[in-house]
């Protein structure tokens, strides 16, 4: 801080700044100076943003003898709501009313800050300009009638009162760090001068030192090098003031936080290290709605009012911000996995409670909270109410569900909870500008307010400040890095407000109103950066996506140089460099105990053939992927329905001769009963999956498919169906497996056929090879039906009904392939040899699983891995390289 500025503050001079961050920066600098001077205590410096100074003066007037004629100040949320009401009433066809209102409110603020309203009629107005003029007149009319004012006009209101003795005014005031004083600000300072206050302007003095321009490969490398540079400067001097200026901070915020965190605290992502004390602070806050605590509140509120995505309900169930979350955390996670098997993609609160009641998940606190929440919704959250009434109801509803949870909140959560209460208070204050509304509208508006509220938790003072281009104005640093200064990004393009004439904005000199104004502002900011620190680095990326970039012309005069930086390693690399590594063979699991039961049936063999690790993870460790709730029936469920209908039909018909003798009407009635029972069964399992006419449509589909299939069966010779949906226990390679065999037929001459229904594509080749894709039919053959003369898939598919199988004899089954077959390259020369090949191959696969073979060995990489649930577990990407498509991950 400049010594003369500190002396003036000590003498009682007030300082106003263009933003809160600069005010806090000056306060910190002033307090540090007092500590260094050895003072045990000192008066608080009167340093605050100009907007806060104006509000303080307004507050003095509000509690003085002039309060009776003073307009009441609207909060920003009230302004936004009033503009929305005016626009909605004037133009019922406009869809994006909140977005339009935000731009109109910005136009209103610009018009007052730059004194544009008196000049508005001197410029031709387009449709948007005329709309703004009409809406603004309506806004002013309501303001006069209701005696309102707003942030855009408050400085003018206060300026008219400054001559009053009751209004507190400093003897002297310095406006510090203003890049440009706008007309309204100049009028306010003039009014202060007339009222007897000495007003002067000031800013930080220029500093010399090293200046360089640095080219980086891309924005990621640019951020990484800036982080390494900042850490190096901090390690060299723990008291250094370090600034990182990012013109497009909102765009790069997440990458900056991730990379700076990894460079400053390499172990920040380790479990248990929830909130490390980072030495940097990012000025740009995030929407309040993005904080987990606030998001959980909205998930609960939205579930009370309408159906929501199951994924959102899942997040709510597992949220730590509900009552009993810590006590039931594991059981709630297990409940979530169970609900996914029966839930639809969207759920209501009542439907969610019904689903939970069907599972014995052991979550009594969750059930009690949700039940009470549903009761409160019916008792209180209905009808049309005022915003303040809804605010009370929302607070009470969240209390009923146990928000914000039973565990203690950390610092960020605690501050977010406090900000949530402030948001509810702002919402309650909308009574002044909004009529009564329904619950859904109230929650929607509250969420929009949370999205519009940028929140940055308070942190201790840190040496590294990451700032936007305007926030660095007036601040001094020992080291300053400005990034992103490519020819595409700097200067930024103009952003004129669409509701004000562009010619007016250009004529008035609004910085973002024209290309010339944007260029001039960027030139001034660039010049200021170059004289605000002892060391200044200006960087730019050479590439973005597939485009080549150059340095901005505004920094071309700064010499381009290389910058030597320490090579900070990541936590992973640091571990490897210590060389204290243990090597462990992870391809061998403990063998199965003799007689140990293994679930999964024939899928154990199929999965081990596809990849030994997949079988180990799924069938020994139980590492199943989470189900994705789906609407209606998925392919597996449709196939199950077909299986059940045909199984019931053959359980009644039994023989080919009986099928031939069954009349069309009788057969239709039989299939209709079978379809009815199959649909009823699946509705018991998933009550909402088929209702009303959808159930009837599905029954007709099933009858149609089954009838078409039975017509194909009539083309066969005589046979008897010996078994359908038959439970079998299979012993092979030390494995004992339980499975359900779809069907076994016996021809009139005594030859048996093992059949497996398929509603998708089926091919005999899927049964062949050392690692067959579909081993179930050969497995049934060698373990339970060793004398069978054929195995076949029954492809029950509309328009493509057929048997796809292998047979000893050509006459046993339509379309069955016999051996040798030149087109089946992996088949044995004869049926007997093929059976022995199956027996040997399946025994080898089963023995491998029993012995603990857990190699990561996909049969066909990457196809085998494309839809596998255990990819993160086996780390196939690290082993073989990430060649899977992004959309398949």
Name the predicted role of every residue range.
Residues 1-660, 664-665, 676-685, 689, ...:
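Polyanion-engaging groove/track-forming segments
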Residues 402, 406, 411, 546, ...:
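RecB-family 4Fe-4S metal-dependent nuclease core
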């Amino acid at each position: 801080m400049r010594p003369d500025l500190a002396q003036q503050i000590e003498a009682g001079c007030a300082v106003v700044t263009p933003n809160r961050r600069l005010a806090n920066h000056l306060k910190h600098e002033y307090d540090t100076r007092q500590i260094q001077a050895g003072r045990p205590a000192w008066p608080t410096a009167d340093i605050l943003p100009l907007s806060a100074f104006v509000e303080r003066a307004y507050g003095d007037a509000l509690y003085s003898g002039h309060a009776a004629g003073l307009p009441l100040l609207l909060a920003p949320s009230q302004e936004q709501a009033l503009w929305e009401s005016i626009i909605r009433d004037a133009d019922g066809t406009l869809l994006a009313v909140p977005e339009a209102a935000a731009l109109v409110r910005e136009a209103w603020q610009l018009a007052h800050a730059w004194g544009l309203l008196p000049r508005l009629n001197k410029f031709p107005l387009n449709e948007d300009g005329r709309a703004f003029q009409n809406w603004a007149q309506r806004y002013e009319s309501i303001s006069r009638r209701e005696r309102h004012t707003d942030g855009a006009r408050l400085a003018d209101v206060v300026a008219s009162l400054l001559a009053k003795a009751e209004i507190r005014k400093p003897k002297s005031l310095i406006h510090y760090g203003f890049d440009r004083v706008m007309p309204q600000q100049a009028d306010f300072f003039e009014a202060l001068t007339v009222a007897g206050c000495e007003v002067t302007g000031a800013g930080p003095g220029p500093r010399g030192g090293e200046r360089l321009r640095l080219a980086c490969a891309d924005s990621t490398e640019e951020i990484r090098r800036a982080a390494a540079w900042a850490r190096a400067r901090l390690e060299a001097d723990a008291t250094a003031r370090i600034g990182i200026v990012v013109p497009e901070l909102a765009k790069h915020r997440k990458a900056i936080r991730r990379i700076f965190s990894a460079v400053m605290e390499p172990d920040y992502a380790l479990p248990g290290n929830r909130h490390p004390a980072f030495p940097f602070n990012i000025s740009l806050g995030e929407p309040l709605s993005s904080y987990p605590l606030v998001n959980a509140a909205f998930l609960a509120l939205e579930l009370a009012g309408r159906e929501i995505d199951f994924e959102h309900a899942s997040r709510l169930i597992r949220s730590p911000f509900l009552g009993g979350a810590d006590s039931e955390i594991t059981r709630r996670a297990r409940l979530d996995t169970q609900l996914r098997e029966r839930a639809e993609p969207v759920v209501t609160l009542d439907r969610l409670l019904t689903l939970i009641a069907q599972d014995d998940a052991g979550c009594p606190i969750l059930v009690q909270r949700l039940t009470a929440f549903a009761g409160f919704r019916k008792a209180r959250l209905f009808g049309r109410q005022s915003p303040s009434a809804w605010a009370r109801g929302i607070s009470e509803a969240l209390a009923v569900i146990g928000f914000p949870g039973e565990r203690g909140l950390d610092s960020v959560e605690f501050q977010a909870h406090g900000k949530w209460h402030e948001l509810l208070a702002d919402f309650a204050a909308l009574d002044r500008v909004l009529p009564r509304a329904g619950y859904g509208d109230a929650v929607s508006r509250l969420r929009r307010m949370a999205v519009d509220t940028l929140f940055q938790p308070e942190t201790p003072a840190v040496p590294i400040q990451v700032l936007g281009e305007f926030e660095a104005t007036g601040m001094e640093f020992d080291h300053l890095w400005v990034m992103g200064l490519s020819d595409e990004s700097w200067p930024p393009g103009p952003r004129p407000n669409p509701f004000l004439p562009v010619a007016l904005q250009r004529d008035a000199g609004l910085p973002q109103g024209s290309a010339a104004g944007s260029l001039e502002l960027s030139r001034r900011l660039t010049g200021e950066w170059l004289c605000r620190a002892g060391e200044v680095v200006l960087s730019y990326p050479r590439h973005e996506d597939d485009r080549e970039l150059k340095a901005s012309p505004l920094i071309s005069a700064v010499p381009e140089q290389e910058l030597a930086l320490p090579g900070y390693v990541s936590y992973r690399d640091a571990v490897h460099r210590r060389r204290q590594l243990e090597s462990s063979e992870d391809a061998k699991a403990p063998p199965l105990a003799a007689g140990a039961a293994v679930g999964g049936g024939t899928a154990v063999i199929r999965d081990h053939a596809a990849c030994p690790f997949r079988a180990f993870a799924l069938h020994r460790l139980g590492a199943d992927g989470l189900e994705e709730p789906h609407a209606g029936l998925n392919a597996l469920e449709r196939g199950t329905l077909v299986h059940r209908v045909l199984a019931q039909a053959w359980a009644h018909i039994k023989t080919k001769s009986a099928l031939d003798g069954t009349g069309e009407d009788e057969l239709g009635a039989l299939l209709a009963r079978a379809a009815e029972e199959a649909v009823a069964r699946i509705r018991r399992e998933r009550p909402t999956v088929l209702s009303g006419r959808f159930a009837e449509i599905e029954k007709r589909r099933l009858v149609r498919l089954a009838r078409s299939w039975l017509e194909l069966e009539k083309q066969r010779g005589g046979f008897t169906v010996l078994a359908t949906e038959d439970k079998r226990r299979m012993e092979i390679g030390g494995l004992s497996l339980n499975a359900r065999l779809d069907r076994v037929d016996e021809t009139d001459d005594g030859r048996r056929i093992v059949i497996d229904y398929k509603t998708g594509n089926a091919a005999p080749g899927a049964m062949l090879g050392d690692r067959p894709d579909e081993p179930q039919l050969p497995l049934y053959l060698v373990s339970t039906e060793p004398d069978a003369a054929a195995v076949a898939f029954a492809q029950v598919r509309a328009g493509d009904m057929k048997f796809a199988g292998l047979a000893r004899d050509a006459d046993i089954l339509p379309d069955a392939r016999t051996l040798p077959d030149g087109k089946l390259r992996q088949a044995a020369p004869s049926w007997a040899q093929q059976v022995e090949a199956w027996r040997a191959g399946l025994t080898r696969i089963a023995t491998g699983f029993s012995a603990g073979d857990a190699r990561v060995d996909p049969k066909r990489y990457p196809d085998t891995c494309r839809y596998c649930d255990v990819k993160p577990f086996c780390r196939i990407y690290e082993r073989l390289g990430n060649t899977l498509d992004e959309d398949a991950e």
